[in-house]
Amino acid sequence: MKTVVVDFSNLDDLSGFGEIARNYAPRLAKVSDALPTLHFIFIVPERHKGEFGCHIDYVSREHLKSDIKPYAHQIDLWHATHQQFKYRMHGKGIHQLLTVHDLNYLHEKHGIHLLKHKLKMPLMIRRSDTVIVISEYVKHDVEAHIPLLNKELQVIYNGISDVEQQEQRKPAFAGDTDKFFLCIGQVREKKNLHTLIPMMKYFPQHKLFICGANHWSYADTLRALIAPADRERILLTGKIADDEKCWLYAHAEALLFPSRLEGFGIPVLEAMRFGTKVFSSRYSCLPEVCACHASYWDSYAPEAMAQVVKEGLASWSRDGAEAEAARTYSRTFNYDRYTEQYVSLYHKLTADSR
């Protein structure tokens, strides 16, 4: 039997890494009971130890270095599920698997902070035996900027949860009869949200809800762009609960996603599950992930953006053929497939170990 360590340190995080951990951990635990050749050790926050069954071993994120020592000579494979991991054990016979989600630091960091990442990421990849990326876009980014030393990159797309089957709850900021557009994600400069605010003058009967963590200074930049008369119409709501998110997807006229930097772009696929029209930028991975199931902005002039939205909505019905095609497409990105692909990879990588 081979022993595989999987890092689920981010289980409690309200982030993309946390979302993946909360979906992947229970599915992997469920299928692992029927995998006689693999034994799993999950790295989890202390309070989650034992949560996924007694057939799994657990080490706590808080005491990782000490808790993992008794297993040191048993480990065949260590899966760092993202590039921001805090620790991984290196040793003879331990195959290092790394999943890379993006190289956004190339576009976001400057000066000494950029230099730090430019030094750290190649070292991280050099010390990995196998590297997985979450989109073709990320694959091309890594190949263009990091020496791979003959490593072949493999793409395993993220899954998304079955949000359309989850409970819904109307947020307090949403009225019963509001017509609104939705934007979901961290309120950061890379999300390009400032382009939406002048566009909204062409939709005086609509509200715009920008939902997500907004403690960065960019949120203040957006607030300054919102005219006093529009402050009840264009809202930075802050973080929202999952049931609120599902209600908003189900009732929004459209999801607006002008982001410049995405490793994957989960909200566009989640919106499709509800038959909600998606408007997207053509930047980074978004054309790859949305494919033909979104309308795209080629200009960020407010009137041109508004025209794309008006034309897209005019031919869209939540119950129409285009919406159903988008739903079907979105369902191909699921965590059952994601789990199956990683389990297959674990089998392959441990076949010749030790």
Each language-model region and where it sits:
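Carbohydrate transferase catalytic cores enriched for Leloir-type hexosyltransferases
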Residues: 1-354
